[in-house]
Amino acid sequence: MKENQKLLLLCGDSYQNISLLAAVKEAQKLNVKDGNVLVLYLGEENTITQEAGEQVVVSKLKLDALRTTLLSYTGSRLLLAFADKQILNLLFRLEETGFFKDASIRIIGPSLQRYRTFYQQADQRRLFQELGYQVPASALVGSVREAIEFSEGIQFPIMIWPVASKQGQGRKIAHNLDDLCEAVETGLSVSPSQQCLLEFSTYGFKELDFVVMRDREDNHYLAASIESIDPVGIHSSDSYQFMPAVTLTDREFQNLREAAIHISRYLKLTGAISIKFALDPTSYAFYILEVNPFASDSISLASMGLGYSLFEQGVQLQLGRSLEHLPHPLLKDLKAVYEPSLDYIFFKIPIFSDAAKNARLNTQIHSYGAVYGFGKRIDEAYQQALETIKDKNLLTILPEEMSDDELIQKIARHMPHRLFYILEALKRGFEFEELLDLSKLAPVYLQVLANLVEMEKVAEAENKPAFLPVEPSAGLYEVKVGAAYYLTQNGTNESLGLDAACVLVDDLEICDEYFYQKVRKQVKELKEKGQQVILLTNRPFTESLADKVYYLPINETSLHLIQTIDQVKDIIKLSDRQ
């Protein structure tokens, strides 16, 4: 391959830099075998691009800038797994001029023509209808007047989607005509095509994400089902979420699974694909909200919950590898096509800054990160994530100091930390039915919180702490070396002790963008000295870094539990607070 002929991972701006961080990590791995992989980031220079050095090429998100940059890499290949709709818009325009043919640049994975079929939400809706799926009534508008005309034939609330806006900027739910006019005016200003998709809102429906992995030969599996506790109308990044989805009936689950696979197959998408659904809680009816074949927070969450990177596997599939030939990342003697069957719950709690604590949650992102927990049950996984919040002093509110009236207002208004307010109300003896009416939570979710209150009353002497591996076969297959373990309060321990091991404590900040590089560097240095390394961390990694990993809150209790299993000769704390 000539010097200027590269594999370019096109990457756009994203929430918490998920796309950029994942692209840089995959480029580093691919370059171990082939030094001709670069990340082409369309956005502004930032600390991540600077830290990555020559690994990342930065270009403005402009047509001329992208054309000029690509001309430096004639004969190269483009991979779009980390791109977004704004990048697609530029690529479509370049394709129309014959640029890619003239520059001998080839797009690998799904073709641009394939992406065109669902580039706009309106196109997606038509496609879903052709496939026999329900879609909300909708219209593509280019002016406020057109929006008003559409609203006259439909009931509020109405969802406004600016077409191809950056990170979903401008999305809003309008509850009346004034809301609609304001939202459409804003949406038109942030849409590259000056268009907005208006649709009947599924506000209040149950929101779910299904992640499908598929290769060119149509081998596929359902990697994850993610359930949001907050309903449609609150951005999934701000919602409490868990996987796998366990409150669905078998019929509901199978309907959504079949739809996710059917759509991925029909569109001939490869790699990791996230499909977002709205499920009517009063019937089996569901709506398809979005199909996303790019890096997303859903795929990131699924990767952390499974213990291996779906980004990495997705890149391999887009490069032409087969699920039947790729080895499974975690399980011995298995191929990657294996469909996960989890016997644990992985839970996400969003975290908010002090400035956002009084915001009213909606379709815009207000959180700046998240903490996670594992457990045998939803309440146990939630409790573990909650301990991390307490240990890190991330909670910017004090529900116990609020009056009953204040709690009621916070619960009813869909504000950040809402579950903390509900927990406090349960402790004060609020009636279950009263909280159902206030919060509009599904009864099953409120029962989880009620269980938590009861858990706090159980004497510690009744608990039998045990470590179980994070793996996708529910204990059916043996895990590879370097497995990660989570803690459950009742079970049989499966973590075999290590002798004379060093415990590396990941006490870095929750939103430290370089945590992966820092931890990997420290583990490598310790291993080069011949040490066995145990990693204690409260953030799930998607690959094996140490000889063993424990996902636990960072505190003395966790260290004590590890020392009951492993012979620890040294403890090293990796922290930003030296």
Label the model's feature ranges.
Residues 143-154, 195:
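Conserved phosphate-binding catalytic cores of ATP/NTP-utilizing and phosphoryl-transfer enzymes
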Residues 471, 489-492:
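Low-complexity, acidic/Ser/Thr- and charged residue-rich accessory regions of DNA metabolism proteins
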Residues 2-65, 69-74, 97, 131-132, ...:
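ATP-dependent carboxylate activation and anion-phosphoryl transfer catalytic cores
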Residues 83, 143, 554:
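Flexible loop residues that form catalytic
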Residues 61-135, 140, 566-578:
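Conserved N-proximal alpha/beta basic substrate-recognition cap immediately N-terminal to
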Residues 76-84, 429-433, 475-479:
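N-terminal-biased segments
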Residues 465-482:
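Long, low-complexity segments enriched in small/aliphatic residues
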Residues 140-143, 271:
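Short, glycine-/polar-rich solvent-exposed loops and beta-turns at beta-strand/coil boundaries
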